[in-house]
């Protein structure tokens, strides 16, 4: 278990439970903040700032209610030029869902483009069907308000997330690759 944490955007990583305890990997990637989202989420290392969200990897688990605090935690970390690791147990569903919501908020991406952006860095990313539904609802009903809130709270972002994400998606063949996988 543990294929290493993956960089999604500058200062933003996704990993699994093992990655979150790997001091060498955390130091190498200059991780100062960890967002843990799993059943027994709790701070584990000294000198790291934590946001711990107890949540099951179940389609009935409501992650939407944690989007705002997660977005705030990640964004404040990155605005300071620091790095944040978002992890669950496997780094596939819960953590990916929170990072997708973040990317949707800091760009103009819908949930599918945000998912493709995450998968470009972490190919195993696959939110469960319930989390996918929550992201679809977030896109339809809430993301515009979150974008407005972020701008009011923090002003214009010096981060180049929209450009970074668009460059990731523009990489040769990335969208064709995901379209091919979807057909399998």
Swiss-Prot record:
Result when mutating residue 88 to S: Does not dephosphorylate UBR2
Cited PROSITE patterns: TYR_PHOSPHATASE_2, TYR_PHOSPHATASE_DUAL
UniProt entry tagged with the keyword Transport: no
Effect of residue 93 to A/N: Over 150-fold decrease in catalytic efficiency for p-nitrophenyl phosphate
Catalysed transformations (reactions): O-phospho-L-tyrosyl-[protein] + H2O = L-tyrosyl-[protein] + phosphate; O-phospho-L-seryl-[protein] + H2O = L-seryl-[protein] + phosphate; O-phospho-L-threonyl-[protein] + H2O = L-threonyl-[protein] + phosphate
N-myristoyl glycine-type lipidated residues: 2
Modified residues (Phosphoserine): 58
Chief localization: cytoplasm
Active site: 88 (phosphocysteine intermediate)
Record flagged with keyword Chaperone: no
PTM summary: Myristoylation regulates subcellular location, and is necessary for activation of JNK.
SUPFAM superfamilies with a match to the protein in the record: (Phosphotyrosine protein) phosphatases II (SSF52799)
Record's keyword terms, sorted: Cytoplasm, Hydrolase, Immunity, Lipoprotein, Myristate, Phosphoprotein, Protein phosphatase
Cross-referenced Pfam families: DSPc
Tissue expression remark: Ubiquitous. Highest expression seen in heart, placenta, lung, liver, kidney and pancreas.
The protein's Enzyme Commission number: 3.1.3.16, 3.1.3.48
GO BP terms, alphabetized: cellular response to epidermal growth factor stimulus; immune system process; intracellular signal transduction; negative regulation of cell migration; negative regulation of focal adhesion assembly; negative regulation of T cell activation; negative regulation of T cell mediated immunity; negative regulation of T cell receptor signaling pathway
Assembly and binders: Monomer. Interacts with LCK; the interaction is direct. Interacts with UBR2; the interaction is direct.
Family (UniProt): Belongs to the protein-tyrosine phosphatase family. Non-receptor class dual specificity subfamily.
Functional note: Dual specificity phosphatase; can dephosphorylate both phosphotyrosine and phosphoserine or phosphothreonine residues. Activates the JNK signaling pathway. Inhibits T-cell receptor signaling and T-cell mediated immune responses, acting, at least in part, by inducing degradation of E3 ubiquitin ligase UBR2. Dephosphorylates and thereby induces 'Lys-48'-linked ubiquitination of UBR2, leading to proteasomal degradation of UBR2. Dephosphorylates and thereby inactivates tyrosine kinase LCK. Inhibits UBR2-mediated 'Lys-63'-linked ubiquitination of LCK.
PANTHER family according to UniProt: DUAL SPECIFICITY PROTEIN PHOSPHATASE 22, DUAL SPECIFICITY PROTEIN PHOSPHATASE DDB_G0269404-RELATED
Protein name, as recorded: Dual specificity protein phosphatase 22
Organism: Homo sapiens
């Amino acid at each position: 278990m543990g294929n290493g944490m993956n960089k999604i955007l500058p200062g933003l990583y996704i990993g699994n439970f093992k990655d979150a305890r790997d001091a060498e990997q955390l130091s190498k990637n200059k991780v100062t903040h960890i967002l843990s989202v799993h059943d027994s989420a709790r701070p584990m290392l000294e000198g790291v700032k934590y946001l711990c969200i107890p949540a099951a990897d179940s389609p009935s688990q409501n992650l939407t209610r944690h989007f705002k605090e997660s977005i705030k935690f990640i964004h404040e970390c990155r605005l300071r030029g620091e790095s944040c690791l978002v992890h669950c147990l496997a780094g596939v569903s819960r953590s990916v869902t929170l990072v997708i919501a973040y990317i949707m908020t800091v760009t103009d991406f819908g949930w599918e483009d945000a998912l493709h952006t995450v998968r470009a860095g972490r190919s195993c990313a696959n939110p469960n069907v319930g989390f996918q539904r929550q992201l679809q609802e977030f896109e339809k009903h809430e993301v515009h308000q979150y974008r407005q809130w972020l701008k009011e709270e923090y002003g214009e972002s010096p981060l180049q997330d929209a450009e970074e994400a668009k460059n990731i998606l523009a990489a040769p063949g990335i969208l064709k690759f995901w379209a091919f996988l979807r057909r399998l």
